Curated annotation (Swiss-Prot):
Main localization (coarse): cytoplasm
Keywords: ATP-binding, Cytoplasm, Fatty acid biosynthesis, Fatty acid metabolism, Lipid biosynthesis, Lipid metabolism, Metal-binding, Nucleotide-binding, Transferase, Zinc, Zinc-finger
Cofactor(s), names only, from the UniProt record: Zn(2+)
Subunit structure: Acetyl-CoA carboxylase is a heterohexamer composed of biotin carboxyl carrier protein (AccB), biotin carboxylase (AccC) and two subunits each of ACCase subunit alpha (AccA) and ACCase subunit beta (AccD).
One Pfam family from the record: Carboxyl_trans
EC number: 2.1.3.15
Entry's cofactor comment: Binds 1 zinc ion per subunit.
GO cellular component terms, A-Z: acetyl-CoA carboxylase complex
Gene3D superfamilies according to UniProt: 2-enoyl-CoA Hydratase, Chain A, domain 1
Pathway linked to the protein: Lipid metabolism; malonyl-CoA biosynthesis; malonyl-CoA from acetyl-CoA: step 1/1
This protein's name: Acetyl-coenzyme A carboxylase carboxyl transferase subunit beta
Zinc finger (C4-type): 33-55
Gene: accD
């Protein structure tokens, strides 16, 4: 490589974000789509809800960005923001669980992998829980389970509909049984919510897997999903080795689940708030004064 080529490559790196396929995050003015490799101006991508304008790929977004898309401006009131995980088992693999918690908290600014609260959607009340995949893969530990259970219980008392935005690798193995029991605890809270004939909707985003899929992600009155989201319990390789069969290429995608009746509707990110508004109105949710949220 000549000196001129070296400077040209160095200059290009300053402007083109190095996008990871796992995070879809870059550090430059331009971002390459991990699906179609189209290069887009970062500000244009953000203004399009972090969806590729060329292929429609829905890049991962964080919990704050989700809330901004769903909730009316300044309407979100967060609950239980002080809850933080501990290390009850003193778990350690290559690194200690305590160190992993600290690293995720420092990297995301979150205490754990979910944000919960009340908000309004076009002036209609909604209890909202948003999982954040950046925090240890969105895994469900005792704090995530407790916060989701509490927001369901609050919604039941206030007669509010619920939306849970799912993005998770499943139960958090570092907490053992304390993690697994959250599946039953959340499901029990949802049953009480359902007994009052209140609306519950999960939104399945990429990826929604493991214990989250096996519990509250599939208990909705209406199950929504983002396009091409990976949704499943066990991984493709595990299933193929168990069944000794080759699975379809689109297996465990939102489109495959819609075709087979596990998902009710696939919603593009730009249409989410409009779709939620229609669903809430159809189910008779009344507008609520901002002061009452």
């Amino acid at each position: 490589m000549s000196l001129i080529d070296w400077f040209a490559a160095r200059r290009k790196d300053q402007f083109v974000g190095k996008v990871s396929q796992d995070t879809d995050e870059g550090d430059g003015l331009w971002v390459k789509c991990s699906e179609c490799s189209q290069v887009a101006y970062r500000k244009d991508l953000i203004s399009n809800f972090n969806v590729c304008s060329n292929c429609g790929h829905h890049n991962r977004i964080n919990s704050d960005e989700r809330i901004n898309i769903i909730a009316d401006k300044n309407s979100f009131k967060e609950f239980d923001s002080s809850l933080s995980p501990t290390d009850p088992l003193g778990f350690k693999d290559r690194r200690s669980y305590a160190d992993r918690i600290k690293e995720s908290q420092a990297g995301t600014g979150l205490r754990d992998g979910v944000i919960t609260g009340f908000c309004s959607v076009n002036s209609m009340p909604l209890a909202l829980a948003v999982m954040d995949f950046r925090f240890m893969g969105g895994s469900m530990g005792s704090v995530v389970g407790e916060k989701i259970t509490r927001i369901i219980e609050r919604a039941t008392i206030e007669n509010y509909p619920i939306l849970i935005v799912c993005a998770s690798g499943g139960a958090r193995m570092q907490e053992g049984m304390l993690s697994l029991m959250q599946m039953a605890k959340i499901s029990g809270a949802l049953k009480k919510h359902k007994e009052k004939n209140l609306l519950y909707m999960p939104l399945l985003t990429h990826p929604t897997t493991g214990g989250v899929t096996a519990s509250f992600a599939m208990l909705g009155d209406l199950i929504l999903a983002e396009p091409k989201a990976l949704i499943g319990f066990a991984g493709r390789r595990v299933i193929e080795q168990t069944l000794r069969e080759k699975l379809p290429d689109n297996f465990q995608t939102a489109e495959y689940l819609l075709e087979h009746g596990f998902v009710d509707v696939i919603v593009k990110r730009k249409d989410l708030k409009t779709t939620l508004t229609k669903i809430l109105k159809i189910h008779g949710v009344k507008e609520l004064a901002e002061a009452n949220i």
